[in-house]
Design a protein with these regions (language model features):
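Peripheral, non-transmembrane regulatory/ligand-interaction domains of membrane transport proteins
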Residues: 1-120, 124-125, 135-146, 175
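Hydrophobic alpha-helical transmembrane segments and their immediately adjacent juxtamembrane loops
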Residues: 138-176
Length: 176
């Protein structure tokens, strides 16, 4: 998933590849006017405020993804300690997902920090969006922290799975 943004004083253009359902949902609310209050909140202010709202909804979506990862970690823990099942495949898939998301989130943090420095160019003079973007950075930091912890946990599960598999193989070889 990739999102490109172009903005000026009175406009914001987004182009995205892949499935960015939260962004599509936000656009549909504005286009179809299904929630007039939300539409006014999104469209009635500056381009910088709209950019904040877009980034915020995407970061919130990442928080949902992180919660799913934590649930998958719990499932993998059960599999690692189950003698009848192998966890190698699930560990590999989840490690890849965590690594990919970490790369995305670290890039997003740099972009949000840089954007926060240049906000006033695209805001109305009475608008101070610093607190809004600081709040987004706090959420991004929470995602990063959780992903870092998840990565460490995955490494522990990987090592444990390897040790238990090796021990099981050694027992089988000892019997033979």
């Amino acid at each position: 998933r990739q999102l490109s943004v172009f903005m000026g004083n009175d406009y914001l253009v987004t182009i995205h590849q892949g499935d960015l359902k939260p962004l599509v949902d936000m656009i549909n609310v504005c286009r179809e006017n299904t929630d007039p209050q939300r539409r006014q909140r999104l469209m009635g202010r500056s381009a910088s405020f709209l950019l904040h709202e877009i980034i915020d909804v995407l970061v919130d979506d990442m928080l949902h993804t992180v919660r799913k990862i934590l649930g998958n970690l719990d499932d993998i823990e059960d599999i690692v300690f189950d003698d009848t099942r192998s966890a190698a495949r699930q560990i590999s898939f989840l490690r890849r997902e965590i690594t990919t998301l970490r790369r995305i989130v670290h890039s997003l943090k740099r972009i949000v920090l840089e954007t926060g420095k240049n906000l006033q160019r695209f805001s109305r003079t009475e608008e101070d969006l610093t607190l809004y973007f600081d709040d987004v950075i706090d959420h991004v930091d929470k995602v990063i922290e959780t992903l870092d912890e998840s990565k460490e946990t995955m490494e522990i599960y990987k090592d444990t799975d390897f040790m238990l598999s090796t021990e099981k193989a050694n027992k089988i070889l000892a019997v033979l």
